[in-house]
Amino acid sequence: MGIKTLIWLSILVVGIYCEISDEDAPVHYCFVNPPPKTRLSPNLLQNITTCTHLVYGSIPIDRDTGYPQYSVSDVESGYDIDNIRTFMRLRKYHPNAKLLMGVVRTKPFEDAATSVKVANGLRSHVKSKRFDGLFVTFNGIHLEYRASTSFLETISKDKKMSLTFGVTGRRVFAFDALRRLQEINDLVEYIYLDMGELPSNEELARVTHINPLFYNGSIPFEETIQGTVEELSKEGILPSRIVVGLTAGGWKFEIKETQDPLKISHGQYAENNGKRVSYQDACRARGAVIYDWQTMNEITVYRQTWMSVNLPTIKAMGEKMKWILGQKFAGIGISHALFDDPRGDCGTDPLPAHRLVMELIRNTIPANPAKCTRLCYLDPEEVEETFPIDNLKSDYCSHIVVPYFALDLSDKMIEEDKAEDLVKKIDDWRSKIVEVAPRLILSVGSKQASTIWQFLLGNDFHRKELAEGLVKAINSTNADGLEISWTSQPMVSDFDKKNLKSFINDIVAADTAKMVEIVVATSQQSAYSDFYDYEHLNKTASLIVLHSHRLHSDSLPFTGHPSPLRATSSMTNQKMSWESLLSHWVEKRVLPSKLVLSLSASTLSMQSLADVRSSAATPFGQSAFVSMLRSKKGDIHSQQEICESLKSGTGVTHWVDGAEVPYLRRYDQMVAYENTRSAHIKAVWASMEGVGGLALHNMHQDDPSAVCDNRTAFPILNALSRAQVCQTCLKQHDFKKCEQHDFVVSCNFELKRSTPVFKTDIVPYERCTEVVVEQATLTLGGNVNFNDVQQEQVVKNLTSLRSKMVKCGMVLSLSCGDSEKYLNSILGDNMTFAIGNVMNIMEKYKFSGVQLDCEKVIRRGNHIYFNTFVKKLAQKFESGKASNGCNRTLSARFSHYTQKPSTYYSVSLLNRLSHIALRMTDKHSVDLPFFFNHTKPEFPSTEKFVNIWKNVGLKPDKLVLELSPFGWQTGKKVGEKKKMTQGVNCVTAGNRAVYEHDYETLTGMTKHENGTINMPMIEDFRYKIGYIQREQLGGIALNVNGDDYTGICGRGSFPILKSVYSSHKCR
């Protein structure tokens, strides 16, 4: 047979190179698998610019040396073809893509040692060929054995090598496959789910649809894309770890003469084995065409031929792709290019399926809704055409506000310059994330002088005409609302106040359909002059935006900051702070939930009268040139310019305590600005105050191209979205009912001698969904014992309260000992006896549940024992009710020391438990930092470990965060800490001690004669509960021994626990 030479037509497409650099963007796997003796075209995938992973071949690796078994055309041979070398030239067109060698192992590994040997040999060879990594597939029963994990584990040790594991839908449901995939999940970059082969394909003569999306009556649910990925998700393999592989072309079957081709269905037997057909062959097939809207496939029937084809159009294969992207899978793959009409024989552009993926990925932005109210302002006069709006994450903004209408004396209103173009750009971006797109608000009058406002609003006819025109204009666009912004200059009289009120009423009257959201922007000058009708705004405006980002101006003859949190002593006007402005509006009885506080991504540059670059003088209140008397040529305007000044060493940044803001000194220039730290603090403070939302003005200055760290676009918005929470009021549960609680409040009660005053009869069970009693121990032989007689007596006392606790759970915390060998002995030889003893002690002391606290003794050697123990114990629990008549509960407790949960635990099993408690404390029982620190990524934090557990597949509503009420007093030695309860703190520092709040550590700090005390405050707990609600976690756990259970602090007993349900700042 001679050499086949395939000459691909040049693909003439005008387009912009799309670099997939966003870590959240979908990946695109592109496969090239040329048959033997076929020459690969070097420009085959030249214009498919979204390929992030290029995979060559499906090369056998059945030799135990690991050396790939190449075909005659893979590498240079007598045929003068070296397709691998040609493939490597694709790097020219895809400089950011990873080039992977595709390998397949059919022969099972004899043992783990063989798998390691094969892996090492293969890894060395792949490096010699200069591939970036491997795409590994097993064609056989390999997933039944752990040697397959050893093979991938050995390859994964090379951190420079990219590794993808491919598994077909057919193999997912094989024996032990899901367990093996859980182990593999942490070893690879992605798991590639190839839906080209299904369980039905075990018998090649069975009629099979190609990549069916949904169940259609004849297709088993587990053979659909939806069913397969749901099974993986249940086992803790999240969509974000899965690339869904689709197939170019389809399946072709010759059916029996006795069968009606129009009535044939998935799973029936054909006359002969099915054949895979390329799209270029399928598109030329004759016959009747039927479209199946469940499988999203085209069915072609001609005589006794039946064919299921992936039709590469937006309404067919595109629906599968849109579903995959909409479900937030890691990405899509198409196998393979040579089956995807590479020459355009079907009359369309070549590679139609690949082009469809490219189009959808380019038009897809990973979409999540904003979890709190955040207004993002873009000024059409300031925003350049190249503004990278696609870098804006969908959850950063709940509203986008554009100054759109200018007021005009003759025409009433006109469009701002470039406003229409900007709105079109925003609309295009919103169309990519339709379901969770931010609301679009068009602003009127933000740049007009008060005289124009007074003229138009002072005349009843002009005012009503303006209101009707604005509502009509809003309804003619895709906008959702209108912002009324009389803010460029302040109002000057009560007439202005009256006319603004009438104008709002006219807009409400003109909006007969009640579709226009009304936002009112306010200035600090008008507010402090009481030129707003506060009661009227409370009733009519959905949001009231305070211009708290304009509290200082460069037109003033002294230095200052546009948005200090609090006033400093040197500030000329003590009212010009966030704290004072918010207090003013709240004192006027405006609902805090309606108020939006503003900050800006832009800077305020001022020129001091002397060179104060190295001066330690108070930064605010110094004499400065007013803006009209100085040149602004060298001013810093944006976040990226701040970064450039700091990197070059021309500027030095300083921090102002109290005001909680930074400023930069550059010779005689002072630049006041916001950074991620100040934005974080403002977001936490505003959240604690129950403020309705935050607004970021001049968003285009917030480093939209990630110049500062080459990682985070819009860093201030990112900081706001991470730190802002929106508290909703928690309804106290009814402890007299056995209902499933939406929010768990787990009260941990310690059995120890150090708290003799804590009598069992004051345990606040009515405020707890469960009381967790700490702690009994599982001992050798499978017995359950308390540490001493006194502890057991305390348990007996609690049991006597059981009737009063009614349906409130009483849960036994059960330790598994102190060593791995200890647990091995218990569960290896006495598991059944241990389970029986757990049930006996529950019955004896009327416990309704058990919380397993076994983390420190779980290792690779015994984790299977533990998972089996949990599974059998859960089955026992399900067989009956607890002593209080409710379902028994089984939970588990872990800490930040478990950094790879899926290595030791069955995530699917944990998802079936009542909940998982996360203990995030140090050795002093003090909470670890709450937020992840990007500068110290190795440092533990609550945010980091919540994400770790969510990323391995634990359901968010199963996660219960333990919040510590303990604080600490600094000791005499460096680093020494003395743990303190809330009550001891009040005794030590006194009830009247004043605490300085730290919005980063979420503690209060006070100094007294014996040292410094740091204590978590009630506001901190309320904030953390807001975070838990925002992330839709399961609830909180609180050690009630650390709360002020005696009421010595003057706020009644258990003030922290009671604050869970009572706060005037929630909504």
From Swiss-Prot:
Signal peptide range in chain numbering: 1-18
Location(s) in or outside the cell: Secreted
Enzyme class of the recorded protein, top EC level: hydrolase
Keywords: Carbohydrate metabolism, Chitin degradation, Disulfide bond, Glycoprotein, Glycosidase, Hydrolase, Polysaccharide degradation, Secreted, Signal
Keyword NADP: no
Molecular function terms, GO-annotated: chitin binding; chitinase activity
SMART domains, alphabetized: Glyco_18
EC number(s) on file: 3.2.1.-
Highest taxon of the lineage: Eukaryota
Disulfide bonds listed in the record: 30-51, 376-397, 747-768
PANTHER family attached to this UniProt entry: CHITINASE (PTHR11177), CHITINASE 12-RELATED (PTHR11177:SF317)
Protein name (database record): Chitinase-like protein C25A8.4
Record organism: Caenorhabditis elegans
